[in-house]
Curated annotation (Swiss-Prot):
Name of the protein described by the UniProt record: Aspartate carbamoyltransferase catalytic subunit
Task performed by this protein: Catalyzes the condensation of carbamoyl phosphate and aspartate to form carbamoyl aspartate and inorganic phosphate, the committed step in the de novo pyrimidine nucleotide biosynthesis pathway.
Organism lineage: Bacteria, Bacillati, Bacillota, Bacilli, Lactobacillales
Tagged with keyword Transferase: yes
Residues making up the signal peptide according to the UniProt record: none
Species of origin: Pediococcus pentosaceus (strain ATCC 25745 / CCUG 21536 / LMG 10740 / 183-1w)
Length: 308
């Protein structure tokens, strides 16, 4: 698989996923690489981010890359410059890799068609794809169960507006897992019906191996269609309460891509509880992003001696 760019999980095979997990685990165990020359990366985030942004920064730093600063609010984007021209600019100064998060779905397609030398890594596009989050989630699940086939995975919350739901549902299907969705009926996306079954959360808690919660994506919900919930009301109706968590299987785990709205989609203390793998996901995220970037570097011939 050509990893010059990583923009979507659509073309990933099971072997591609397992390769990424193995490589991430190697970095976790102390693997290092040597670059053939100074490598320059830039993270262009047009939406707010804590985990993805800092995780990529840490991954780039650990791999010995040189990071160029970019702030959307102080860039020429505020003067009307298009995303394409912004990326063509940083390509012109010979930046090697751009990690981009953008509110527009499929923003990366125009960049891939522009015949640029710079590699594009998708840090999240609107409600479309979030490949690095999906891969770190697969790593977390694999660490727990050592397989995907036949696992029952519930994705619960604001499904319609979630790029994590789309990427994970798509990838989990390819890996042989059974996917279920839960949440307000108005937020059940039609395009995801091909990937899983929609059921009330009370029907799912006892049967699933993984309960993956999602926050309400207020920034993507138009005001005229917004469903208004008080946090406690939403928790009781659609979230993971103590009572529901008590009914989960002994080996089942709780996941969340974060940020977590404690007391809304999940009881606060469950975030730090025995079943939670939420902060483990974040640690895995750094190593998985090292793996993602390493495959890009390898495709560009920038690793001394190649990847072994």
């Amino acid at each position: 698989m050509n990893m010059h760019d990583l923009t979507t999980v659509e073309s990933f095979s099971e072997e591609d996923v397992l390769h990424k997990i193995r490589l991430a685990e190697e970095f976790k165990n102390g693997k290092t690489i040597e670059l053939t020359r100074p490598v320059y990366a830039m993270n262009l985030f047009f939406e707010n981010s804590t985990r993805t942004h800092t995780s990529f920064e840490m991954a780039e730093s650990r791999l010995g890359m040189r990071l160029l600063e970019f702030e959307a609010k102080t860039s020429s984007v505020t003067k009307g410059e298009s995303l394409l021209d912004t990326v063509k600019t940083i390509d012109a100064i010979q930046t090697d890799i751009a990690v981009i998060r953008h509110p527009q779905n499929d923003y990366y397609k125009q960049l891939l068609e522009a015949d640029l030398n710079i590699s594009i890594v998708n840090g999240g596009d609107g409600s479309g794809q979030h490949p690095s989050q999906s891969l770190l989630d697969m790593m977390t699940i694999y660490q727990e169960f050592n397989h995907f086939d036949g696992l029952k995975i519930a994705i619960a919350g604001d499904i319609a507006h979630s790029r994590v739901a789309r990427s994970n549902a798509m990838l989990l299907n390819k890996l042989g897992a059974e996917v279920y969705f839960a949440g307000p009926e108005a937020w059940m996306a039609e395009d995801l019906k091909a990937y899983g079954t929609f059921l009330p959360i009370d029907e799912l808690v006892e049967k699933v191996d993984v309960m993956m919660l999602l926050r309400i994506q207020n920034e993507r919900i138009s005001q005229d269609t917004a469903i208004k919930f008080e946090p406690h009301e939403y928790l009781q109706e659609y979230g993971l309460t103590f009572e529901r968590a008590d009914r989960m299987q002994p080996t089942a785990i709780i996941m969340h891509p974060a940020p977590v709205n404690r007391g809304t989609e999940i009881e606060s203390s469950l975030v730090d509880g025995e079943k939670s793998r939420i902060f483990k996901q974040m640690t895995n995220g750094m190593y998985m992003r090292m793996a993602i970037l390493t495959d890009v570097l390898e495709a560009k011939g920038l690793i001394k001696g190649g990847l072994h």
